[in-house]
Amino acid sequence: MSGGLDILSLKEDDITKMLVATTHLGSENVNFQMEQYVYKRRADGVNILNLGKTWEKLQLAARAIVAIDNPSDIFVISSRPIGQRAVLKFAKYTDTTPIAGRFTPGAFTNQIQPAFREPRLLVVTDPNTDHQPIMEASYVNIPVIAFTNTDSPLRYIDIAIPCNNKSAHSIGLMWWLLAREVLRLRGTISRSVEWPVVVDLFFYRDPEEAEKEEAAAKELLPAPKIEEAVDHPVEETTNWADEVAAETVGGVEDWNEDTVKTSWGSDGQF
């Protein structure tokens, strides 16, 4: 698929990421249509995927995505919780439409319901859990790209990307690699420059583990310093209320000392 071009070949850094994320580890069961992607079978029964074919199918999927003129017509779907964050991040950087969580039945076939959509391409995380949108896409002739494990059914799937779709790190890495390849083909980022978006942003995080990490981080913080209270001397002040009362009492005249005279008579008699 790389056409002999070294710039399109799988780099050692990407191979290391795949091995660390266990992308090459399949399941113990193998679908007969997935046998072509199996490299070897270990002694414990786990099948090993061929990462070279994984990279070729990922490039093919990226070219199919870039061929769509309007990116919002591409729907990226994940019913499994481990792929929902990766789907949202992929949609953010590639301007596609995400469906993270439960898929509404009839969204592609029932034109009466408000949630009816007409996508031109689907990208799903797991054919087993996302079987409903894949089935509806087959009714209306929508091509489907899927991340498939060794035991995944390939019915109604046009482009299968073999990988470990049961691991949170593996599925996050595959969505990250697909997003990077799409942006490279669009010319948004250069192949000679490393994409600044780290792959950790695509990994699923358990809410309980995140709370535990936050609690542990708070415990490591130093305790706030408490300043000791200092007693400051209080200046003696005079009671201003007593002074005002004394001045008021001393300055008031006795109103009853003078005889009240009227103007009705000269000697004050009626």
UniProtKB/Swiss-Prot annotation:
<dbReference type="InterPro" id="IPR005707">
    <property type="entry name" value="Ribosomal_uS2_euk/arc"/>
</dbReference>
<dbReference type="InterPro" id="IPR001865">
    <property type="entry name" value="Ribosomal_uS2"/>
</dbReference>
<dbReference type="GO" id="GO:0006412">
    <property type="term" value="P:translation"/>
</dbReference>
<keyword id="KW-0963">Cytoplasm</keyword>
<comment type="function">
    <text>Required for the assembly and/or stability of the 40S ribosomal subunit. Required for the processing of the 20S rRNA-precursor to mature 18S rRNA in a late step of the maturation of 40S ribosomal subunits. Required during oogenesis and imaginal development.</text>
</comment>
<dbReference type="InterPro" id="IPR032281">
    <property type="entry name" value="Ribosomal_uS2_C"/>
</dbReference>
<feature type="compositionally biased region" description="Polar residues">
    <location>
        <begin position="261"/>
        <end position="270"/>
    </location>
</feature>
<keyword id="KW-0217">Developmental protein</keyword>
<dbReference type="GO" id="GO:0000028">
    <property type="term" value="P:ribosomal small subunit assembly"/>
</dbReference>
<keyword id="KW-0687">Ribonucleoprotein</keyword>
<comment type="similarity">
    <text>Belongs to the universal ribosomal protein uS2 family.</text>
</comment>
<dbReference type="GO" id="GO:0003735">
    <property type="term" value="F:structural constituent of ribosome"/>
</dbReference>
<dbReference type="GO" id="GO:0043022">
    <property type="term" value="F:ribosome binding"/>
</dbReference>
<dbReference type="GO" id="GO:0005634">
    <property type="term" value="C:nucleus"/>
</dbReference>
<keyword id="KW-0539">Nucleus</keyword>
<dbReference type="InterPro" id="IPR018130">
    <property type="entry name" value="Ribosomal_uS2_CS"/>
</dbReference>
<dbReference type="Pfam" id="PF16122">
    <property type="entry name" value="40S_SA_C"/>
</dbReference>
<protein>
    <recommendedName>
        <fullName>Small ribosomal subunit protein uS2</fullName>
    </recommendedName>
</protein>
<dbReference type="InterPro" id="IPR023591">
    <property type="entry name" value="Ribosomal_uS2_flav_dom_sf"/>
</dbReference>
<dbReference type="GO" id="GO:0022627">
    <property type="term" value="C:cytosolic small ribosomal subunit"/>
</dbReference>
<dbReference type="InterPro" id="IPR027498">
    <property type="entry name" value="Ribosomal_uS2_euk"/>
</dbReference>
<dbReference type="Pfam" id="PF00318">
    <property type="entry name" value="Ribosomal_S2"/>
</dbReference>
<comment type="subunit">
    <text>Component of the small ribosomal subunit. Mature ribosomes consist of a small (40S) and a large (60S) subunit. The 40S subunit contains about 33 different proteins and 1 molecule of RNA (18S). The 60S subunit contains about 49 different proteins and 3 molecules of RNA (28S, 5.8S and 5S). Interacts with oho23B/rpS21.</text>
</comment>
<feature type="region of interest" description="Disordered">
    <location>
        <begin position="251"/>
        <end position="270"/>
    </location>
</feature>
<keyword id="KW-0689">Ribosomal protein</keyword>
